[in-house]
Amino acid sequence: MAPIPLLRRLRRGRPVVVVSGLPRSGTSMAMKMLEAGGLPILTDGLREADGSNPNGYYEFEPVKQLDKQGDTAWLAEARGKAVKIISFLLTYLPESYDYQVVFMRRDLGEVVSSQNKMLDVRGEARGAGDDRTSALYAQHLEQVERFLRQRPCFSVLMVDYAAVLADARGQAARINALVGGHLDVDRMAEVAEPALYRNRRALL
């Protein structure tokens, strides 16, 4: 999480703030915190809030085309803003930009449980068994974290979902430090809602 050298910053412009992680790992909560803190966000609002994500999804449709060699010109607009990009798409980001990545981590059993509940609500079939899915996710996260460490265009902060709910202000301060220290940490902490933490393994 070393600071970006001045010459590199002058050449490439402001970094893109990326909120990433597995689906249902707290990425929307992190986006909401950044927005509340005063950071501009890049979202189109096409996917509306629902029972699974009452605060909204904070998605941006062009992101979904990254693995299809879609147009990445929108990244120029994303400099100095936060955009949500799930972990499966991080490896497709061009290295001609700098990225400050807030990477959300959550207990994998809770992630799978939350995903299953969302699929049930939608009436969609579940995929592999829970243990198999958790193992695949663990392998994927290891690969992605290795990828991020090996590329100087990424500055990464790992943020634990449960830690945000236990100490929202402390984690907000860490996120604020990553992105330059100009956000309202108190406002960030206020929007982290423990009431949304519905899928703790102890309650399953």
Where are each of the predicted segments found?
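Detector for methionine-enriched segments
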Residues: M1, M29-M33, M104, M118, ...
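Short capping/connector residues at structural and topological boundaries
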Residues: P62-V63, R169, M188
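PAPS-dependent sulfotransferase catalytic domain
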Residues: G80-D184
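A general structural motif at alpha-helix termini
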Residues: Q115, E190-A195
